[in-house]
Regions:
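FNR/FR-type flavoprotein reductase catalytic core
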Residues: 84-245
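Ferredoxin-reductase
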Residues: 2-91
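Local cysteine-cluster metal-coordination motifs and their immediate loop/turn environment
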Residues: 125, 226-228, 248-282
């Protein structure tokens, strides 16, 4: 762990508070990790020990952080033996957590119309960011989510109007609806009320509906698979709006020591290699996906 991050990343023996399973081997895990909960910001993640038999931790994005209750929520999909073992945890079990790690999203006040785009396991940071933005009256978040497997929540028709949303696209995330945050869903799987296509195409459709003068108020934030992030960056370029993307990358140490997660990033001084774990995971889309 580098000296810069030593005082902001905590190791905690977190107690499992709840563990809910959804379709397609997706889980929402709530952990008692008060230090992490107090310091987490949207876009940061935790490095978990899935089981004592495995030496390597797994990075998981934080979906919610409740400082008052000292808890964090993470959403994950079982891929590989490590997360399969994590899925066996029940309330009362303990999980070693290292976090929060990483630089998160930084909304800019001059662009209060925030477009949040999440795909698959890239959904959690968007929920976290939406929760923080709704606490401030000046921000106007719109959350768009895409998935090709059943969503990790029970979608329902929205009662919040989203001007510019394609006709019939009414499915939403209930939690966001309860917060008063508008959301819409996209999928190629033909789920009721969802936009039939990629979530980035839904984002483009909504941006197209805006008066060109309104684009100066919009900033995009995205998290998901690399192919989705490239598409989000292209949409942002097309409409001339800034976009921050949260990258997904394989990690070993996750605290900047091994540089195993380094990616090429364009900087004013030229190309550079940046560590996704501590230099990111959030970067300007133009730096990661230049024209």
């Amino acid at each position: 762990m580098t000296p810069t991050h030593r005082n902001t990343i905590f190791i905690e023996d977190a107690k499992v508070l709840s563990h809910e399973r959804f379709d397609a081997n997706q889980y929402v895990l709530r952990l008692e990790a008060p230090k992490c909960a107090a310091a987490a910001t949207p876009g940061s993640f935790v490095h978990l020990t899935c089981d004592e038999s495995l030496p390597m931790r797994r990075p998981l994005s934080i979906m919610r952080a409740d400082a008052a209750r000292g808890s964090i929520d993470v959403l994950y999909k079982v891929v590989g033996p490590g997360l399969a073992l994590l899925a066996n945890k029940v309330a009362g079990n303990r999980v070693s957590t290292l976090g929060p790690i990483g630089k998160g999203f930084v909304p800019h006040a001059e662009r209060p119309r925030t477009l949040l785009v999440g795909g698959g396991v890239g959904i959690p940071p968007m929920v976290f960011l939406a929760e923080r933005l709704r606490e401030q009256a000046d921000w106007k978040p719109l959350v768009l989510m895409g998935s090709e497997v059943p969503f990790p929540f029970r979608a329902r028709p929205s009662t919040i109007l989203v001007p510019g949303a394609p006709e019939g696209v009414i499915a939403c995330m209930p939690l966001l609806e309860e917060w008063g945050v508008p959301s819409r869903l996209a999928s190629l799987a033909g789920y009721p009320g969802c936009y039939e296509g990629y979530v980035t195409d839904l984002a483009a459709a909504w941006l197209t509906s805006l008066d060109p003068s309104a684009l100066g108020d919009v900033e995009m934030f995205a998290c998901g698979p690399t192919v989705m992030l490239k598409a989000a960056a292209a949409v942002a370029r097309r409409f001339g709006i800034p976009c921050q993307v949260s990258l997904e990358e394989f990690m070993a140490c996750a605290v900047g020591g091994c540089a195993g997660c380094a990616v090429r990033v364009e900087t004013p001084e030229g190309p550079a290699m940046k560590r996704v774990c501590v230099d990111g995971p959030v970067f300007d889309s133009r730096a990661v996906f230049p024209v």
